[in-house]
Amino acid sequence: MSSLPLRSGEKMESPSISDAVPLHAPEDATADFSQPQSPLHEVDSFPVTESSDDVVVNVSEIPNLSPSDDDFDHERNSGEDRDQDHGENPVETDGVVVPIDELNQKIIRQVEYYFSDENLPTDKFLLNAMKRNKKGFVPISTIATFHKMKKLTRDHALIVSALKESSFLVVSADEKKVKRLSPLPEIRDPKIFTVLVENLPEDHSNENIREIFGKAGSIKSVSICDPNAVEESEKGGKKENFIRTRLHAFVEYETVEAAEKAAATLNNEQDWRNGLRVKLLEQAAGKFAQRRPARREVDKEKDTTGRVHDQTGGEKNKKTREHQNHRLHHSDNPADDDGGNHQKDKNGNKGRVVGQGRRQNHQGGNGIGHGTASSSSHPNYHPVEVSKRPPGPRMPDGTRGFTMGRGKAIPPPTSTQTSHEV
């Protein structure tokens, strides 16, 4: 180790914390601060030159100039200090720098609201996540994916450290899950505390409804619903799902007994014009839910019955046509097919001669035994032979397509033509 330069007349003494050395360095001495310097074990002070005057500075007041891993992390993080032990360092949240103490309180309030009695009974996603764990824990990684939590922070360790300070929540031993400290109380079903009111009076303001229904018990809330007004005011928006299409109101009581009393005492069906219609919401909603599937089933049965009827009718018509064709070609008595035309055949072949002739010709092809007695014994009876349709092309009117050449045989030469040739 090189010794420091001494002033004239000074003696070399052992260094101590209280000792100071002049801050002048030789002009030819060069200090390389680009490389890490070894810690000063033997000298606790070193010279620094600010001006021509000699200034003595205590080493304990000067920070260590040797770079460390924390310094490099500081540069990589653009000056953000991630030391979380003191809670004084600001953290950037959604583009805004927030002190870490304030951020911790925001995280605690937000997660406590997720697990609160106000939100949890209506949060189906969080309830299902709690049911997956026997102890009711929810992964903190799941909580961190919520929209409002993303705005606060995405640092998992920061969320864990904040939730540990909560008096309402408990963090698991592995610091990966969180749950309520006290179990969730029995969920209150608002339907059993609420009555549905229809046929409202002309003055159906909130105050008047409270005055009328307050006689049955303590009222928690009153909501008046006008589907027509909502439809006009929310054009193009999402419509609310009302269980009634007319003006109605919901009155929620503090107790079930008060709701039942209101339904029993304030319901007036005798006065069909001005009387109130009061029912428990649970009963009204149940009837409404049962009515809708019943209508769907009726419509489904109608469609099914119509299709079955069409199929049955089509099959019947098809069988009838097949039966008629079968009788037409294989019946022993052709007069049966013509109903009352049998007497006309006796008196002189009246009726549809062509159709009868076809059947007679078809039936009499083997000689005897298939025609009727009256027709076969008639003196003027001549069976009509139906010529087969000649092959060849046909014109649209049914005539043959060619008069000469193809499609028609050349007539034989007459006697005059033969004699002339000779």
UniProtKB/Swiss-Prot annotation:
Residues 1-94, 286-422 are annotated as: Disordered. GO terms for cellular component: nucleus; ribonucleoprotein complex. Residues 48-61 have a biased composition (Low complexity). Residues 73-89, 295-348 have a biased composition (Basic and acidic residues). Residues 97-188 form the HTH La-type RNA-binding domain. This is La-related protein 6A. It holds the Pfam family La. Residues 193-283 form the RRM domain. It is found in: Nucleus. Keywords: Nucleus, RNA-binding, Transcription, Transcription regulation. GO terms for molecular function: RNA binding. Signal peptide: none annotated. The keyword Transcription regulation applies. Transcriptional regulator. The lineage of its organism: Eukaryota, Viridiplantae, Streptophyta, Embryophyta, Tracheophyta. GO terms for biological process: RNA processing.
